[in-house]
From Swiss-Prot:
Assembly: Homodimer.
Protein name stated in the entry: 3,4-dihydroxy-2-butanone 4-phosphate synthase
MF terms (GO), sorted A to Z: 3,4-dihydroxy-2-butanone-4-phosphate synthase activity; magnesium ion binding; manganese ion binding
Native species: Edwardsiella ictaluri (strain 93-146)
Keyword Nucleotide-binding on entry: no
Enzyme Commission designation: 4.1.99.12
Residues that coordinate or bind D-ribulose 5-phosphate: 37-38, 42, 150-154, 174
Pfam families: DHBP_synthase (PF00926)
UniProt similarity note: Belongs to the DHBP synthase family.
Gene: ribB
InterPro entries given in the database record: DHBP_synth_RibB-like_a/b_dom (IPR017945), DHBP_synthase_RibB (IPR000422)
Reactions performed catalytically: D-ribulose 5-phosphate = (2S)-2-hydroxy-3-oxobutyl phosphate + formate + H(+)
Catalytic class of the enzyme: lyase
Entry binding sites for Mg(2+) 1: 38
Length: 219
């Protein structure tokens, strides 16, 4: 069903390329997972390009759980413990402890404050003391191998921003409807059209990587 709805956004390969182009232009992307998985759409942005206005949009239309997707190397650089030692969540979502910038924020809740926290966490020279714990930004550790290892929004975010040429760090938040329910594919696509965002699925990204990477290794 989703593939029929998605045809307006191009072929699977076109959808990935349009998503990468949007990220390079500083725009957001809507990422859908499988209908048989969470069946949710997440707004994602390249962390280093995200604006206050985009963070405000994310907070206004999202679940309120603004996540910063990072690699294991970045988690270690920041000395962020995992939220739990025994992860029993259904999809193994890898939350670390929450964070707040140590400098330049007030309560940490505003769009500006959350973006300040994101920027503190992704700085090249970021160190553990640059962040307070807990806070209002939720880091997520991506699994090595990206969507080829785990078909989650976290891994899709890292793959997309990396393929777009940015450092491997991205912001995501689940899109919700006005009544507080989770947005499904039709609502995600309507939101994407309204805000001029491309739509891509995790399945698209898996196919894109599988098609490209053997060729790159052969070259």
């Amino acid at each position: 069903m989703n593939q029929i709805l998605l045809s307006d956004f191009g072929t699977p390969m076109e959808r990935v390329e349009r998503a990468l182009s949007a990220l390079r232009d500083g725009r957001g992307v809507m990422v859908l997972d499988d209908e048989n998985r969470e069946n949710e759409g997440d707004m994602i942005f390249a962390a280093e390009k995200m604006t206050v206005e985009q963070m405000a949009l994310t907070i206004r239309h999202g679940s309120g759980i603004v996540c910063l997707c990072i690699t294991e190397a970045r988690r270690q650089q920041l000395d962020l413990p995992m939220m739990v030692s025994n992860n029993t969540s259904h999809y193994g979502t890898a939350f670390t402890v929450t964070i707040e910038a140590a400098e330049g924020v007030t309560t940490g809740v505003s769009a500006q404050d959350r973006l300040t926290t994101v920027r503190a966490a992704i700085a090249d020279d970021a160190k553990p003391g640059d962040l307070h714990r807990p806070g209002h930004v939720f880091p997520l550790r991506a699994r090595p191998g990206g969507v080829l290892a785990r078909r989650g929004h976290t891994e899709a975010t890292i793959d997309l921003v990396s393929l777009a040429g940015f450092r491997p760090a991205g912001v995501l938040c689940e899109l919700t409807n006005d009544d507080g329910t989770m947005a499904r594919a039709p609502q995600v696509m309507a939101f994407a059209r309204q805000h001029e965002m491309p739509v891509v699925t995790i399945e698209d990204l898996v196919a894109y990587r599988q098609a490209r990477e053997p060729q790159e290794q052969a070259d």
